[in-house]
Amino acid sequence: MALTEDKSDSDGRRWGKFKLPFRNSNSQAPSASSSSSMATSSSSVTSSHLNQNYIHQSRHFQYHGPPVVEGLGQNHHQSAATIPSMSSVARSLLPTKRRLKLDPSAKLYFPYEPGKQVRSAIKIKNTSKSHVAFKFQTTVPKSCFMRPAGAILAPGEEIIATVFKFVEPPENNEKPMEQKSGVKFKIMSLKMKVPTDYMPELFEEQKDHVSEEQVMRVVFLDPENPNSMMEKLKSQLAEADAADEARKKASEGIVGPKPIGEGLVIDEWKQRRERYLAQQQGGVDAA
């Protein structure tokens, strides 16, 4: 009996040795799983905390360094040619520099005489350091012209031009000061690299370099009501006549075509004036 019990005890101890690792593995498996889940939970909490901290810092972070310029790669949608340079942007923000000084500066004054050709005058001075060509443009070329119609001015040179206009008879017995005119004059300028003779084609050939100096609006003055503007107009017209005579004398010895603006009398004005005078005469005869 004792042998049997000892044998069974020894067998139990032997089997116990073999069973011990399995028991330890079974008992340690939940512990490893628990440690893994705790590590995963800890890492997720840490990652979430870092993400929240990064978002919080990025919201309140302000960059105080030099501006970052994005490079243009081959796959960039916008080409470098379409991006304006800093110099072109700066030029677009700056006001246009005038080459000419005008007197009057924005309006052309005419005496209001219906059915007649009237005149105005304007002084033009080159205030730049280069030779400048100028020319007139008008919205009604059939009833207006300028003399001279254009010229090239040296730096500091001044010229006085005469502007001719036919005044339409009033409609519905409108008073002179109520007569509105939609006629406008535009003065264009072109910087010349080298002095040359004036030709109107210059403005078409170099249209990308042409500048608009001023758009002049027409204002009528009552010749029967003396005022400062009317007196100034008379003085400028007398000066323009003297300058015109000087140009004519200077061009008498020139063989070839006359200067631009000379002798450009529009026959349509004569026809309108004759019709207007005929209407006036018809009214007098009827009376």
Swiss-Prot record:
GO terms for cellular component: endoplasmic reticulum membrane. Disulfide bonds: none annotated. Belongs to the VAMP-associated protein (VAP) (TC 9.B.17) family. Residues 1-14 have a biased composition (Basic and acidic residues). Residues 25-45 have a biased composition (Low complexity). May play a role in vesicle trafficking. The lineage of its organism: Eukaryota, Viridiplantae, Streptophyta, Embryophyta, Tracheophyta. It comes from the Eukaryota. Residues 1-45 are annotated as: Disordered. Residues 99-221 form the MSP domain. It holds the Pfam family Motile_Sperm. This is Vesicle-associated protein 4-3. The gene is PVA43. InterPro entries: Ig-like_fold, MSP_dom, PapD-like_sf, VAP.
